[in-house]
């Protein structure tokens, strides 16, 4: 008899993230990979750099071919990997949290991948992917950043110290949509490559984005105000179809794992440095930063809204 998934595993994962001998010669295995963001964004460049490192280190064993941008739609990519239509994707965990609700614990994590590996959280994440979505979770890159809300007009704050988003047309996505709605915002769900046009036409006049990349997207042409503090943390997960993973020999698996772990460390350091540089640029160009008077309450709502969404989804399974 089908039973609802226990919340015990979710609680264990939340605690974790908040705090080969085979030598026979084989032909090179061809794998395919898709990615969700435009080619000019740093997160795509980082994913492609990791693939290049894997291909170099695993030469003769594995070659990952990268499919063109948008060859599979952004939010369809995780499902395509699960079904085996494509082998790998580098994508945020929130983009497929409907299938693995516990992914909210990754999006809201305040830990580095290295800490999560050490405390066993990465193993819990991988087990969930294997059991519920026919994937293996190999790690997450480009960590160390967070998200801000950027607005066209100066933000207003209510008497309770929280932002007043009445009349604000907020673009959202699966990462932070629940948070925005908990703050009373009217939201418009759209992918990142649709936002510039939406800003230009006045369809939206506010959006969240990571603490790095708004200048690459050129949204700062329209969004001249930032609401502080930063909330959540970035994760670009490297996930792979489980059957494709099991089809690799142990040596190839080890090379892929090793390169991902190295890139977790190097990309984190690089993104943090780049984020600081971009913030200086935004200040120099006149962007205004607005601290939320009730900053602690604001951050608590961000966490609570994500976990409420997670528990609601789990109860339906």
Give the location of each predicted region.
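Bacterial N-terminal signal peptides that target proteins for export
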Residues: 1-11
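C-terminal segment of classical bacterial N-terminal signal peptides
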Residues: 17-25
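N-terminal secretory/targeting leader peptides
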Residues: 26-115, 135-317
């Amino acid at each position: 008899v089908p039973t609802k998934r226990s919340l015990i595993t979710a609680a264990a994962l939340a605690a974790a993230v908040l705090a080969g001998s085979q030598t026979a010669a084989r032909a090179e295995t061809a794998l395919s990979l898709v990615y969700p963001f435009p080619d000019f964004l740093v997160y795509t460049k980082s994913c492609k750099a990791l693939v290049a490192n894997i291909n170099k280190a695993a030469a003769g064993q594995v070659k990952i071919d990268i499919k063109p941008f948008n060859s599979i739609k952004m939010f369809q990519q995780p499902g395509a990997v699960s079904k085996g239509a494509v082998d790998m994707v580098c994508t945020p965990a929130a983009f497929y949290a409907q299938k693995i609700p516990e992914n909210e614990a990754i999006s809201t994590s305040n830990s580095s991948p290295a800490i999560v590996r050490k405390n066993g959280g990465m193993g819990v994440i991988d087990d969930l992917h294997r059991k519920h979505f026919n994937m293996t979770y190999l790690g997450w890159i480009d960590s160390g950043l967070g998200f801000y809300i950027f607005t066209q007009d100066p933000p207003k704050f209510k008497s309770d110290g929280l932002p007043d988003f009445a009349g604000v047309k907020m673009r959202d996505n699966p990462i932070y949509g629940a948070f925005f709605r908990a703050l009373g915002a009217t939201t418009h769900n759209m992918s990142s490559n649709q936002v510039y046009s939406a800003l230009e036409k006045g369809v939206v006049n506010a959006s969240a984005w990571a603490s790095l990349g708004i200048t690459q997207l050129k949204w700062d042409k329209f969004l001249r105000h930032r609401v502080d503090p930063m909330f959540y943390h970035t994760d670009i997960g490297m996930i792979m179809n489980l059957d494709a993973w099991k089809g690799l020999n142990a040596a190839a698996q080890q090379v892929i794992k090793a390169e991902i772990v190295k890139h977790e460390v190097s990309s984190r350091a690089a993104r943090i440095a780049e984020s600081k540089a971009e913030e200086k640029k935004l200040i120099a160009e006149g962007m205004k930063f607005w601290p939320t008077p009730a900053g602690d309450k604001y951050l608590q709502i961000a966490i609570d809204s994500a976990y409420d969404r997670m528990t609601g989804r789990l109860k339906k399974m």
